Amino acid sequence: MILRRGKHKITHYAHKKGNDYGFSEGETLEHLKGKKQIYQWAQKHHWNPQLEVYFPTIAQRPDILLEINGHTVAVEFQCSPLSLEKLLARNEGYRQLKIPVWWILGSPYLRNLRNKKIVQFTQIFRKQFVLLFWDVKRAQLVINQKYWRCSYSRLKYDKKTILMEQIEMLKKKQYHFPSKEIRELSLTTLRLTGHALSECPLVCHDLIASWPAMSIPIIIWRIGVILEIEKFPLFYSWGDKEWKNLLMKVNKSDWLFPGCLPPETIRKIIINQYTNELIAFKVICREDNHLILIHRPQWFNDAQLKLQLVKRRS
């Protein structure tokens, strides 16, 4: 062991590089303080915490190791940046040992947390998607579910306002600040339907909040799905797997990869939600294990007509 002193990091012990039992990452003050607090919190729960137990077969040491109801659980308190590739590699190591792991995030992850990182660290707690944080100021675990959202809106329940915001943002994105993706989708939409993006069918609007799953707003993917199924004749039939593959193919490169869950976990919910809405809008129907295209969704000549329709349904 060597004693390190630093101007910006507090004095701490670290393992020498090159030894046969691995070494800890350089630790910030928050990481050291939070790890101590998590250890004490686990003690209060009688989880028999141990600090940095080394597993030689995978060359990893979790920040804390717990024993909960006879089961071993690893805890990683992550304050520094961590790539998806490194996260997957660490989780694979724990998977080999059949040890579940809790990834608890520090305060740096509260700032400008984009979809990519949300999906990367999404875990399941009590059958719900969550991100876990540790608040060192209050010395407590924070279970955060606030990331459910609708495209282009901070609201979750006011469907009329969400729809208005989505229509206005689609106009803005298409005509004023088009990204390459929006520009291509706009041209395809105009070529195939003669309409602008803001005039898309009502079923394209995600008015029910969903957990992040893509690097683009879900409404862009949903419009793409409608354009894709319009290539098929009425009464075309898809098997369940064929239908899922069709929807996954749309904006394929924009699906985000989770680091703590099986790849299909979040995507499956997004696909099922849209499938159910397409059934509710009578675009498709289910017959045994097949989905049948029975109606082409209506594009609007005036986006304001959509607002009136939502008013009547509200």
List each model region and its residues.
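Interdomain/boundary linker segments immediately adjacent to catalytic/signaling cores
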Residues: 1-29, 292-305
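Acidic-basic catalytic patches of nuclease active cores, encompassing PD-(D/E)XK
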Residues: 13-51, 67-69
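Conserved catalytic cores of phosphodiester-cleaving nucleases, focusing on short active-site segments
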Residues: 38, 63-83, 94, 103
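Short, solvent-exposed loop/turn elements at beta->coil junctions and helix N-caps
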Residues: 52-57
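Beta-rich catalytic cores
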Residues: 60
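Catalytic cores of nucleic-acid endonucleases
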Residues: 79-131
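Non-catalytic C-terminal interaction segments of nucleic acid-processing enzymes
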Residues: 123-314
